[in-house]
Protein backbone atom coordinates (compact mmCIF):
# COMPACT_ATOMS: atom_id res chain seq x y z
CA UNK A 1 0.00 0.00 0.00
CA UNK A 2 2.82 2.39 0.94
CA UNK A 3 4.61 1.74 -2.38
CA UNK A 4 1.47 2.53 -4.38
CA UNK A 5 0.96 5.78 -2.44
CA UNK A 6 4.53 6.81 -3.23
CA UNK A 7 4.01 5.89 -6.88
CA UNK A 8 0.85 8.03 -7.01
CA UNK A 9 2.70 11.01 -5.50
CA UNK A 10 5.60 10.59 -7.96
CA UNK A 11 3.18 10.27 -10.90
CA UNK A 12 1.32 13.40 -9.81
CA UNK A 13 4.62 15.25 -9.68
CA UNK A 14 5.58 14.05 -13.14
CA UNK A 15 2.18 15.00 -14.55
CA UNK A 16 2.59 18.45 -13.05
CA UNK A 17 5.97 18.69 -14.77
CA UNK A 18 7.97 18.40 -11.56
CA UNK A 19 10.68 15.79 -11.10
CA UNK A 20 10.24 13.62 -7.98
CA UNK A 21 13.20 15.24 -6.17
CA UNK A 22 11.86 18.71 -7.01
CA UNK A 23 8.38 17.76 -5.83
CA UNK A 24 9.80 16.85 -2.44
CA UNK A 25 11.80 20.08 -2.07
CA UNK A 26 9.57 22.64 -3.81
CA UNK A 27 7.80 24.88 -1.30
CA UNK A 28 4.02 25.08 -1.38
CA UNK A 29 3.95 28.83 -0.73
CA UNK A 30 6.33 31.54 -1.97
CA UNK A 31 9.02 32.59 0.49
CA UNK A 32 9.33 36.19 1.69
CA UNK A 33 12.07 36.71 -0.91
CA UNK A 34 9.84 35.30 -3.67
CA UNK A 35 7.03 37.61 -2.56
CA UNK A 36 9.34 40.58 -3.15
CA UNK A 37 10.48 39.09 -6.46
CA UNK A 38 6.90 38.68 -7.65
CA UNK A 39 6.12 42.25 -6.66
CA UNK A 40 9.19 43.46 -8.55
CA UNK A 41 8.39 41.30 -11.58
CA UNK A 42 4.86 42.64 -11.91
CA UNK A 43 6.28 46.17 -11.90
CA UNK A 44 8.98 45.16 -14.39
CA UNK A 45 6.27 43.76 -16.69
CA UNK A 46 4.33 47.01 -16.22
CA UNK A 47 7.45 48.92 -17.24
CA UNK A 48 7.66 46.87 -20.43
CA UNK A 49 3.95 47.29 -21.14
CA UNK A 50 3.98 51.04 -20.48
CA UNK A 51 7.13 51.70 -22.53
CA UNK A 52 5.82 49.61 -25.43
CA UNK A 53 2.41 51.30 -25.29
CA UNK A 54 4.08 54.71 -25.40
CA UNK A 55 6.30 53.66 -28.29
CA UNK A 56 3.32 52.10 -30.12
CA UNK A 57 1.61 55.48 -30.00
CA UNK A 58 4.71 57.42 -31.06
CA UNK A 59 6.70 55.10 -33.36
CA UNK A 60 5.42 53.40 -36.49
CA UNK A 61 5.74 49.68 -35.72
CA UNK A 62 3.01 47.14 -35.12
CA UNK A 63 5.45 45.13 -32.99
CA UNK A 64 5.00 47.51 -30.09
CA UNK A 65 1.21 47.20 -30.15
CA UNK A 66 1.35 43.41 -30.30
CA UNK A 67 3.95 43.05 -27.57
CA UNK A 68 2.13 45.56 -25.34
CA UNK A 69 -0.79 43.11 -25.26
CA UNK A 70 1.54 40.26 -24.39
CA UNK A 71 3.10 42.25 -21.55
CA UNK A 72 -0.40 42.86 -20.18
CA UNK A 73 -0.93 39.10 -20.16
CA UNK A 74 2.35 38.69 -18.25
CA UNK A 75 1.19 41.30 -15.73
CA UNK A 76 -2.15 39.52 -15.38
CA UNK A 77 -0.40 36.19 -14.68
CA UNK A 78 1.84 37.63 -11.97
CA UNK A 79 -1.06 39.67 -10.56
CA UNK A 80 -3.07 36.45 -10.23
CA UNK A 81 -0.27 34.92 -8.16
CA UNK A 82 -0.06 38.00 -5.97
CA UNK A 83 -3.80 37.80 -5.40
CA UNK A 84 -3.75 34.04 -4.78
CA UNK A 85 -1.11 34.41 -2.07
CA UNK A 86 -2.67 37.58 -0.66
CA UNK A 87 0.39 39.70 -1.51
CA UNK A 88 0.23 43.43 -2.22
CA UNK A 89 0.25 44.28 -5.94
CA UNK A 90 2.18 47.53 -6.49
CA UNK A 91 0.68 48.05 -9.96
CA UNK A 92 -3.03 48.12 -9.12
CA UNK A 93 -3.44 51.85 -8.60
CA UNK A 94 -0.54 53.10 -10.71
CA UNK A 95 -1.18 55.11 -13.86
CA UNK A 96 0.84 54.29 -16.99
CA UNK A 97 4.44 55.39 -16.55
CA UNK A 98 4.20 55.62 -12.75
CA UNK A 99 6.09 53.13 -10.56
CA UNK A 100 6.52 52.47 -6.86
CA UNK A 101 10.12 51.34 -7.38
CA UNK A 102 12.30 54.44 -7.89
CA UNK A 103 14.83 52.58 -10.07
CA UNK A 104 12.08 51.37 -12.39
CA UNK A 105 10.67 54.91 -12.52
CA UNK A 106 14.07 56.26 -13.60
CA UNK A 107 14.49 53.43 -16.10
CA UNK A 108 11.06 54.13 -17.59
CA UNK A 109 11.87 57.82 -18.02
CA UNK A 110 15.25 57.01 -19.60
CA UNK A 111 13.82 54.37 -21.96
CA UNK A 112 11.03 56.67 -23.15
CA UNK A 113 13.60 59.36 -23.93
CA UNK A 114 15.88 56.90 -25.74
CA UNK A 115 13.12 55.16 -27.67
CA UNK A 116 11.51 58.39 -28.85
CA UNK A 117 14.45 59.28 -31.12
CA UNK A 118 13.54 57.00 -34.04
CA UNK A 119 12.40 53.47 -34.90
CA UNK A 120 15.90 51.97 -34.59
CA UNK A 121 16.30 53.48 -31.12
CA UNK A 122 12.85 52.22 -30.13
CA UNK A 123 13.77 48.69 -31.22
CA UNK A 124 16.98 48.91 -29.15
CA UNK A 125 14.88 49.89 -26.14
CA UNK A 126 12.78 46.77 -26.72
CA UNK A 127 15.94 44.65 -26.83
CA UNK A 128 17.23 46.25 -23.61
CA UNK A 129 13.96 45.63 -21.75
CA UNK A 130 13.77 41.99 -22.79
CA UNK A 131 17.45 41.38 -21.95
CA UNK A 132 16.81 42.86 -18.50
CA UNK A 133 13.74 40.65 -18.01
CA UNK A 134 15.69 37.54 -19.05
CA UNK A 135 18.62 38.32 -16.74
CA UNK A 136 16.31 38.98 -13.78
CA UNK A 137 14.30 35.81 -14.37
CA UNK A 138 17.41 33.64 -14.69
CA UNK A 139 18.66 34.95 -11.34
CA UNK A 140 15.47 34.12 -9.48
CA UNK A 141 14.75 30.80 -11.19
CA UNK A 142 17.66 29.04 -9.47
CA UNK A 143 15.72 28.90 -6.18
CA UNK A 144 13.02 26.23 -5.75
CA UNK A 145 9.56 27.76 -5.99
CA UNK A 146 5.96 26.55 -5.79
CA UNK A 147 4.84 24.90 -9.02
CA UNK A 148 2.54 27.77 -10.01
CA UNK A 149 5.28 30.35 -9.46
CA UNK A 150 7.82 28.26 -11.39
CA UNK A 151 5.34 27.92 -14.26
CA UNK A 152 4.81 31.69 -14.31
CA UNK A 153 8.58 32.25 -14.38
CA UNK A 154 8.94 29.75 -17.24
CA UNK A 155 6.20 31.46 -19.26
CA UNK A 156 7.69 34.91 -18.65
CA UNK A 157 11.11 33.69 -19.75
CA UNK A 158 9.72 32.11 -22.92
CA UNK A 159 7.78 35.30 -23.70
CA UNK A 160 10.85 37.46 -23.13
CA UNK A 161 12.91 35.35 -25.53
CA UNK A 162 10.14 35.65 -28.14
CA UNK A 163 9.97 39.43 -27.68
CA UNK A 164 13.76 39.71 -27.83
CA UNK A 165 13.71 37.85 -31.14
CA UNK A 166 10.98 40.15 -32.50
CA UNK A 167 12.89 43.31 -31.55
CA UNK A 168 16.17 41.91 -32.90
CA UNK A 169 14.79 41.31 -36.42
Language-model segment annotations:
Residues 1-7:
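Bacterial N-terminal signal peptides that target proteins for export
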Residues 8-16:
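Bacterial N-terminal signal peptides
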Residues 18-25:
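Sec/Tat signal peptide C-region and signal peptidase I cleavage site
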Residues 25-169:
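All-alpha RGS (Regulator of G-protein Signaling) helical domain and cognate RGS-like helical scaffolds
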Amino acid sequence: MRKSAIAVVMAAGLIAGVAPAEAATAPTRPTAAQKLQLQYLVEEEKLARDVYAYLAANVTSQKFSNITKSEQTHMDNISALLKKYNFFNPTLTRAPGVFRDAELQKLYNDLIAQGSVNLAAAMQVGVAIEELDIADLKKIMVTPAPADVKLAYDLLLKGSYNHLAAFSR
